[in-house]
Design a protein with these regions (language model features):
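Short, surface-exposed acidic
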Residues: 21-22, 170-175
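Sec-exported extracytoplasmic/periplasmic mature domains
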Residues: 57-61, 163-171, 185
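Secreted, luminal/periplasmic, and some membrane-associated catalytic domains
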Residues: 1-115
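Substrate-binding rim/cap in mid-to-C-terminal beta-strand-loop elements of soluble/periplasmic
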Residues: 1-46, 122-166, 181-186
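Short proline/glycine-enriched turn/loop segments at secondary-structure junctions
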Residues: 91-94, 125, 170
Length: 187
């Protein structure tokens, strides 16, 4: 929906809060980080945030909208990434000095680029959904049987997994990541 683009969202919110023509909201596209004008007074910012949250949370294509404060207050996630909640996924990529004032997450299978691509964009930085998060990593060697690791992995798991495959000892307490089962069959 083009109404979710930062430009359209800004025009709607600016009208609602009585500041038409002023750029109140900045962003890179219709999902992800949204930034408020740093020149807003505390009262103006609260009004802009309240109206923006209400509008976005009522939109049928929006899965969630989190404020910077909500994300910052969320403990860093632990455990397997496939078990994280949306706010934990947001927290895992949160950087206080650079992250937006709001994080807009669209529902699964909603493309963040409306028809007649916005700003010439043809791709995004992804989403919290498996279709964007799960990236295939292929290991192959002569005689290796096909096997799909059903559990979520992280890129830091590649090195200890390959090290184990070639018999290279790696002290587990000195590296990030874990050794993955790459061999088909039991054990």
């Amino acid at each position: 929906d083009k109404g979710l683009t930062p430009k359209a969202l800004n025009a709607t919110i600016a009208q609602k809060v009585g500041m038409p023509g002023r750029t109140l909201i900045w962003g890179d596209g219709p999902s992800g980080d949204l930034y408020f004008d740093k020149g807003l007074s505390a009262a103006e910012r609260t009004r802009v945030e309240t109206e923006t949250l209400a509008l976005l949370r009522a939109h049928p294509q929006v899965a969630a909208v989190f404020t910077k404060a909500q994300i910052a207050a969320t403990p860093a996630p632990t455990g397997r990434p496939e078990n994280w909640s949306l706010i934990e996924e947001a927290r895992a990529s949160f950087y206080p000095e650079r992250s937006g004032d709001l994080l807009l997450l669209l529902k699964p299978n909603v493309m963040a680029i409306p028809e007649q691509a916005v700003m010439g964009a043809v791709a995004t930085h992804g989403s919290p959904w498996d279709m964007d998060r799960r990236v295939p990593i292929l290991f192959w060697r002569k005689g290796m049987r096909p096997f799909e690791q059903p559990l979520g992995i992280e890129t830091v798991d590649i090195m200890p997994s390959l090290a184990a495959l070639i018999g290279l000892p790696v002290p587990q307490n000195e590296i990030d990541g874990r050794c993955l089962d790459l061999i088909a069959g039991d054990g």
